[in-house]
Amino acid sequence: MNITVRIFAPVAFLSALTAAGPLAVSNGTVSFTAKGNMGMSCDGSTSAVKVDEDASAYTVTVQTGTLDSKLELRDKHIKERFLETPKFPTSVIVIDKACLALPESGDKAGECPGTFTLHGQTKPATVKFKAKVAGKVTEIDASFTAHMAQHGIEEVKWAMVKIKDDVEVHAKLTVTR
């Protein structure tokens, strides 16, 4: 499941802030919602996020083994059978800094292209974001849709319940510069 993807994308929207100093990410949460047949929905989240920056991009990495859907057996199946976390322990999103231009204060919304790596396969991703800048603190709300089949993840199903291929990934971050 492409749950971890969300955390990565929002951090990328902070490139304009780096000129003012280093960034510290706090209160970061990445969540996912996977919908299935028969009205089924599976939600999960993690707060384990690592952000790296170079001259051209932000790279956000999440340990896929930290995802928690509040149901131990389901988590075990997701991590072992579908995400194969021993073989693919992380998911990564990379966003180009050139796309990001946050104001010194106020709000901004937009979309940025990037790449998302899950299950060892890297594919394009478009991240929608909203940012609120107040002094040295920026709150970011970002999301994108991850497609399991594009990342080589087999159809997710348990008994008669099947999960749709599109998984919504969402991240909320507070960043201080």
Regions found by a protein language model. Give the residues of each.
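Bacterial N-terminal signal peptides that target proteins for export
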Residues: M1-A9
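Low-complexity, acidic/polar, glycine-enriched regions of mature
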Residues: A19-R177
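Bacterial N-terminal signal peptides
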Residues: F8-T18
